[in-house]
């Protein structure tokens, strides 16, 4: 499928992980690729791709997944739902191209990109094993969740665009629904990603053990070989 993208890193041998990055409104995949450069050295066997939004935005070089003109709490979910099949198809495309399954796929988004990665797991549970949502939110809070995906919310404490309250509400909803979630608040940070945000993200991918591993251990089971994500 044809879509705007920027390959940050492509390993010489078959990829062991897939990291897909999604930018905010008006940005582009090359710019978001700078974030990918933080992940690439720590995951040398990963295919790292920054994916552009499906449609142009007001900025001549910018892209978006859905328009924010006239957006409200009442119509946001419908706009997300309208483009979601294309978003999921894009993730599936890169999984097929890389030969990497959902168990070793991480979706990383900022702002509108974070909305899309969060909503994609709501629409297609198990699409990826990890989600990192920088300064994002759900269009509407999830009522169900599973531990198949570990969700890491990283949010600026002073975000004037997407209020921190949305991240707190998302964490509470996911916990209530039985999901696997972490929330890190970056003090004094607005609607942006800084070094502290990145350190939270890198540490989670390397060191945070998914909750379902503990659940399987407590039940006397163990993860299958195809259910182990080498992100840690």
Swiss-Prot record:
Q: Does the keyword Hydrolase apply?
A: yes
Keyword Hydrolase applies: yes
Indicate the enzyme's highest-level EC class. hydrolase
Q: Which cysteines are joined by disulfide bonds?
A: none
Superkingdom, taxonomy of origin: Bacteria
| UniProt-listed InterPro entries | AB_hydrolase_fold, LYPA1-2/EST-like, PLipase/COase/thioEstase
A molecular function (GO) term: carboxylesterase activity
* Keywords linked to the UniProt accession: Hydrolase, Serine esterase
For this protein, the Enzyme Commission number is: 3.1.-.-
The record's annotation in Pfam families points to:
Abhydrolase_2 (PF02230)
Active site per database record? 111, 159, 191
Q: What does this protein do?
A: Displays esterase activity toward palmitoyl-CoA and pNP-butyrate.
Family, as annotated: Belongs to the AB hydrolase superfamily. AB hydrolase 2 family.
- Write down the PANTHER family for this protein, in alphabetical order: LYSOPHOSPHOLIPASE-LIKE PROTEIN 1, LYSOPHOSPHOLIPASE-RELATED
Protein name (record)? Esterase YpfH
Q: Which organism is it from?
A: Escherichia coli (strain K12)
């Amino acid at each position: 499928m044809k879509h705007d993208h920027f390959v940050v890193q492509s390993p010489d041998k078959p990829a062991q992980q897939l990291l897909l990055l999604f930018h905010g409104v008006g940005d582009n995949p090359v710019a978001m690729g700078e974030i990918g450069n933080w992940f690439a050295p720590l995951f040398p066997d990963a295919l790292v791709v920054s994916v552009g939004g499906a449609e142009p935005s007001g900025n001549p070089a910018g892209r978006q997944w859905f328009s924010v003109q006239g957006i409200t709490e009442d119509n946001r979910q419908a706009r997300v739902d309208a483009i979601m099949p294309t978003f999921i198809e894009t993730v599936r495309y890169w999984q097929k191209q890389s030969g990497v399954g959902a168990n070793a796929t991480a979706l990383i988004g900022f702002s509108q990109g974070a909305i899309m990665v969060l909503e994609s797991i709501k629409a297609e549970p198990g699409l990826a094993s990890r989600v990192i949502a920088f300064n994002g939110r759900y269009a509407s809070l999830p009522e169900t969740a599973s531990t198949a995906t570990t969700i890491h919310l990283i949010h600026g404490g002073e975000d004037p665009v997407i209020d921190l309250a949305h991240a707190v509400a998302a964490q509470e909803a996911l916990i209530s629904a039985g999901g696997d979630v972490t929330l890190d608040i970056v003090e004094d940070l607005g609607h942006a990603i800084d070094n502290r945000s990145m350190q939270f993200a890198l540490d989670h991918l390397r060191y945070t053990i998914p909750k379902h591993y503990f659940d399987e251990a407590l039940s006397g089971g163990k993860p299958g070989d195809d259910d182990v994500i080498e992100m840690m």
